Amino acid sequence: MKKIVFAFCLFWVMATKASGQDVGLSFSYFIPRNGDFSTPISPFSIRGLGVNLNRFVALQTGASLYRMAGLSIIDTPLESNHSLLGPNFTVLVPAELVIQLAGQQVQLDLKAGGFFFYGFDQQLNYGNIDRAIKSLKNWDLANANLSYENNPGFGYHFGTELTIPFSNQLKISLEVNYLVGTAPLPLKGNYSGGNFNSPSETIAVDFKDAKVDFTGLEFSIGLIFSGGNGAGGKGVRGRGRKR
């Protein structure tokens, strides 16, 4: 955990220097499919760093550290509308192509690209896993004992950002992204259980195709403080926002 925090602090310092034109503060949240509402670990998030290829096209990246309350696990026999993994910490690093449509008063950015993510300090949600097993086997009682193999994940995303100026130095940004990603999470172990007044049984499992489902909606609202020097064209894109 200390190494992750140090890496983010170093990235934050470098990114702040690189994005000296515009810096800001925003609050970002992630709503996963069949998961639980998640929040960022402030201030370990900065997004919108990149290079303007021309007036209309830019390449952007960044990094965010999320506290995931719960995520779904897919590609197993266990079916659940609730989170089976979490809580954990997740590092998210996007890379995106941005189409910049600037009007006289507002700017609309259209974004699409891919992302890398990695969850650490993982915990299986045995309460929901046991309930999924009971539903699968039609049992009254179930108790799972599983181990997992953690892996990084990848996916794609698309979204839009609306930037509205209030003055030469202050803007407000509203951003929404839809993310679709998975990370391999093979599960091994066993589960035991049965019905009342019946002998219990133990079943070995090997869910080698299990994956973390990182699909959901990310949205943020923030303030951007401009240095007032509206440099254009190629160069480092000055839109870094610390979330």
Language model regions located:
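Predominantly the C-terminal beta-signal and adjacent terminal strand-loop region
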Residues: E161, P165-R243
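Extracellular loop and loop/strand-boundary signature of outer-membrane beta-barrel proteins
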Residues: I31-D36, T76-L85, L141-Y148, V205-D209
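Sec-dependent N-terminal signal peptides
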Residues: I4-M14
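Short glycine/proline- and aromatic-enriched beta-strand/turn motifs that initiate or cap beta-hairpins
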Residues: A18-Q60, Y66, K211, G216-E218, ...
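Solvent-exposed, glycine/polar-rich loop segments of beta-barrel outer-membrane systems
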Residues: N125-L146, L187-F207
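Gram-negative (and chloroplast) outer-membrane scaffold detector with strong preference
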Residues: L49-S135, I164-F166, F214, S220-G227
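Short sequence motifs at beta-strands and strand-loop junctions characteristic
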Residues: S38-S42, L85-V91, L146-G155, D209-T215
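A contiguous pocket-lining binding segment that forms or flanks enzyme active sites
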Residues: L141-P165
